[in-house]
């Protein structure tokens, strides 16, 4: 199990990403636009740097919904490989069963 503080930190990051997504996208569009002037581009870079560090989507980490485990995460199910296997063995995942050949 991951520490509660780690789960809370990830939840806070997700909240910040959602809050600043539009502003961050607008600033990145100005920076990427070749028609924008150098001054506008530079102002956009400075404003982007002034945003909270955790508002960047790349700082988020996928974690298991049940345990908070950061490694072995399967996006399709939102679970780590360990919890997915346990749920599959109990028959709680529709259409998924242990391989046999």
UniProtKB/Swiss-Prot annotation:
* UniProt entry tagged with the keyword Ribosomal protein: yes
Q: Single GO cellular component annotation?
A: cytoplasm
Q: Name one GO molecular function term.
A: structural constituent of ribosome
Q: Which domain of life is it from?
A: Bacteria
Q: Does the keyword Disulfide bond apply?
A: no
Q: Please give the SUPFAM superfamilies that the UniProt record associates with this protein.
A: Glucocorticoid receptor-like (DNA-binding domain)
**Which InterPro entries did the record assign?**
Ribosomal_uS14, Ribosomal_uS14_bac/plastid, Ribosomal_uS14_CS
Q: Name one GO biological process term.
A: translation
Gene3D superfamilies (alphabetical): 1.10.287.1480
User: What keywords does the record list, in alphabetical order?
Assistant: Ribonucleoprotein, Ribosomal protein, RNA-binding, rRNA-binding
State the protein's purpose: Binds 16S rRNA, required for the assembly of 30S particles and may also be responsible for determining the conformation of the 16S rRNA at the A site.
Oligomer and partners: Part of the 30S ribosomal subunit. Contacts proteins S3 and S10.
Please state which protein family the record places this protein in: Belongs to the universal ribosomal protein uS14 family.
Its protein name is Small ribosomal subunit protein uS14
Q: Which organism is it from?
A: Shewanella sp. (strain MR-4)
What lineage is on file? Bacteria, Pseudomonadati, Pseudomonadota, Gammaproteobacteria, Alteromonadales
Gene name, per UniProt, is rpsN
């Amino acid at each position: 199990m991951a520490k509660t503080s780690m789960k809370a930190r990830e939840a806070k990051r997700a909240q910040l990403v959602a809050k600043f997504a539009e502003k961050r996208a607008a600033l990145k569009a100005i920076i990427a636009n070749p028609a924008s002037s150098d001054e506008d581009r530079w102002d956009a870079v400075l404003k982007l740097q002034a945003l909270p560090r955790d508002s960047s989507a790349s700082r988020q980490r996928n974690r298991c919904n049940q345990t908070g485990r950061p490694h072995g995460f399967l996006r399709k199910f939102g679970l780590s490989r360990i919890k997915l296997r346990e749920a599959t063995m109990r028959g709680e995942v529709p259409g998924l069963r242990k391989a046999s050949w």
